[in-house]
Regions:
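N-terminal ligand-binding/catalytic initiation module
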Residues: 2-105
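Anion-binding alpha/beta catalytic cores of soluble intermediary-metabolism enzymes, centered on
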Residues: 9-20, 97-183, 246, 253-254
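Adenosine-phosphate binding glycine-rich loop
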Residues: 12, 16-28, 32-36, 45, ...
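Generic structural signal for well-ordered, non-membrane alpha-helical segments
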Residues: 15-23, 52, 56, 77-80, ...
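Glycine-rich phosphate/diphosphate-binding loop of Rossmann-like nucleotide-binding domains
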Residues: 46-61, 145, 150-256, 260, ...
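Hydrophobic beta-strand scaffold residues
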Residues: 70, 212, 267, 288-289
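Acidic-glycine-rich active-site phosphate/pyrophosphate-binding loop
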Residues: 127, 136-141, 271-284
Length: 321
């Protein structure tokens, strides 16, 4: 008489195992192709937010380790736009990152918020985060190249791209399928719809074939490639039918209800707070839990920088396409 073996408990995934191969590739490329003289990344910080300052320090440490020249410029808010324009014009600067939020919801003279205006003011040749209007528009339209000849790939937002790489590493993407179909049949719930993380992430996953339930505090929509669809699903029902749940709730008190998590689900936390009871989650059979994505995000930042360098500063184009 045979019996079915019991499913094992959940597994905690260290982001370093995903980030390290990218960092090694960056170091090797800079040493061999650029003779040790890496591209220059400028970070602009105009507020005292400790989380942003910590991220800036972390970025600088990783860049210096891997051969990228990194300079953090701390300025007053009123001087931020001028500092950004200066970095745009500096031929020795190959990438720019602004540490948001800078002005919060404060409106811009030009329409939208001041932070929106700053994002759109970064040159497409230096937008290492891929958040300016040009790259955002291409992302939502599923346009993957800068040029008509399709020799220069677009830059994608760092944290959403990091999550894609994590899902590839964990086998959620089906590499046997053509690009654009590797998530076909996969349901994913993203609990965040910010313009920085949740919305572009939902679009990227939908562009790869997934059905993505996008949840924020007031609504839930279904993202399919090129479509935003009303749905009768609730956060609970969406999570229960999802193979992947991604949490990005910027509130310390929020916890993902464990009864919403099915066996063998991938759970990824992108918030600065832990959105899940880790001990309880890891009791669910087959769960794979990624508590932090920062190391992969920084690796994607470096990857984007080298892609920008090849697209606009180096010919012929080589590895990072």
């Amino acid at each position: 008489m045979s019996s079915t073996p019991a499913a094992t408990a959940g597994r905690k995934v260290d982001a370093a195992e995903i980030a390290d191969p990218f960092s090694v590739a960056v170091r090797k490329y800079i040493a061999e192709e650029m003779h040790g003289h890496g591209p220059k990344l400028v970070g602009l910080l105009a507020h005292g937010d400790p989380a942003a300052k910590k991220y800036a320090e972390w970025t600088g440490k990783a860049c210096r380790r891997d051969g990228i020249r990194y300079e953090l410029r701390e300025v007053e808010k009123d001087d931020l736009l001028e500092a950004l324009e200066s970095a745009n014009k500096d031929s020795d600067v190959h990438g720019i990152i602004v540490y948001y939020p800078c002005f919060g919801a404060f409106p811009s003279f030009y329409g939208g918020s001041m932070d929106d205006f700053l994002r759109d003011s970064i040159s497409i040749k230096k937008d290492v985060e891929g958040l300016c209007q040009f790259y955002r528009g291409n992302l939502y339209r599923n346009i993957r190249y800068v040029d008509d000849e399709q020799t220069q790939k677009c830059v994608l937002p760092c944290t959403p791209l990091a999550i894609v790489k994590i899902l590839e590493h964990l086998g959620v993407y089906d590499a046997r399928q053509p690009h654009g179909e590797q998530l076909s049949g996969v349901n994913i719930t993203v609990i965040n719809r910010s313009d920085i993380v949740g919305r572009p992430l939902a679009a990227m996953l939908a562009n790869d074939g997934a059905d993505v339930f996008s949840v924020d505090i007031e609504s839930l929509y279904l993202f399919r490639r090129g479509k935003l669809i009303k749905t009768e699903e609730t956060p609970e029902t969406a999570c229960k039918k999802s193979r992947v749940i991604i949490t990005g709730v910027p509130v310390k008190s929020y916890k993902l209800p464990l009864e919403w998590v099915s066996e063998n689900t991938v759970v990824i936390n992108v918030a600065s707070f832990k959105n899940v009871d880790e001990e309880g989650l890891l009791q669910i059979p087959g769960v794979q839990y990624v508590p932090l994505v920062g190391k992969v995000t920084v690796a994607m930042l470096q990857r984007n920088l080298l892609r920008l360098y090849e697209n606009f500063h180096m010919k012929p184009k080589k590895f990072w396409q």
